[in-house]
């Protein structure tokens, strides 16, 4: 099982990249799971805090507060541990797991320490001005991976079609990203 930890700022196209990559891998007869660290966080916020599911300013602050300020502050490996536990329960279910919301170094290192083949991909959208307020932009969930080593950089500066065309899947799941590092 190869795990792609996909990082990048909010709005840079992490989910879009993951979905395109998933489709390309599936076209190569690979079994793919797209799994977010925040899937459980969102469920908790809906059930425990009556969150309406909107990632507006209030919703994003709630997600950051519960996910980082409360849970990560007490148990830094809670989210990645949950994902690793699920993957350990189903070791032969998927060839590739794509995690499009990697935000902290431990979310990469924990999986490596558990023996997973981890590829860290950073999605960058040059010149994109985030609509988030300054507090949200400076939150550790947006900045913790700034300068952290990556295996590949994906530049998402055009259309979805441009992004799709820049990703080539070759040799049973090995990907190449145009103008980037091969993964």
What label would you give each PLM region?
Residues 17:
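Hydrophobic positions on the alpha1 helix immediately C-terminal to the Walker A/P-loop
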Residues 23-33:
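Post-Walker A helix-loop "phosphate-sensing" segment adjacent to the P-loop in P-loop NTPases
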Residues 33-97:
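ATP-dependent small-molecule kinase phosphotransfer cores
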Residues 82, 114, 120-183:
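Small-molecule kinase domains that catalyze NTP-dependent phosphoryl transfer to phosphate-bearing small molecules
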Residues 106-113:
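A short acidic, amphipathic alpha-helical/loop segment
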Residues 9:
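P-loop (Walker A) phosphate-binding loop of NTP-binding proteins
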Residues 6:
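Hydrophobic anchor at the beta1->P-loop junction of P-loop NTPases
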């Amino acid at each position: 099982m190869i795990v792609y930890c996909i990082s990048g700022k909010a709005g840079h196209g992490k989910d879009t990249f993951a979905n395109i990559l998933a489709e390309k891998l599936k076209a190569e007869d690979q079994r793919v799971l797209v799994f977010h660290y925040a899937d459980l966080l969102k469920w908790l916020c809906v059930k425990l805090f009556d969150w309406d599911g909107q990632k507006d300013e209030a919703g994003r602050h709630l997600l950051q507060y519960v996910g980082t300020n409360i849970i990560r502050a007490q148990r830094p490996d809670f989210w990645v541990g949950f994902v690793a536990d699920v993957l350990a329960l189903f070791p032969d279910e998927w060839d590739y797991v794509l995690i499009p919301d990697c935000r902290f170094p431990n979310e990469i290192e924990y999986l490596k320490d558990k023996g997973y083949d981890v590829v860290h991909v950073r999605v960058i959208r040059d010149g994109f001005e985030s609509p988030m307020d300054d507090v949200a932009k400076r939150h550790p969930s947006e900045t913790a991976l700034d300068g952290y080593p990556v295996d590949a950089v994906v530049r998402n500066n055009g259309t979805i079609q441009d992004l799709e065309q820049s990703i080539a899947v070759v040799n049973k799941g090995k990907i190449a990203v145009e103008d980037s590092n091969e993964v």
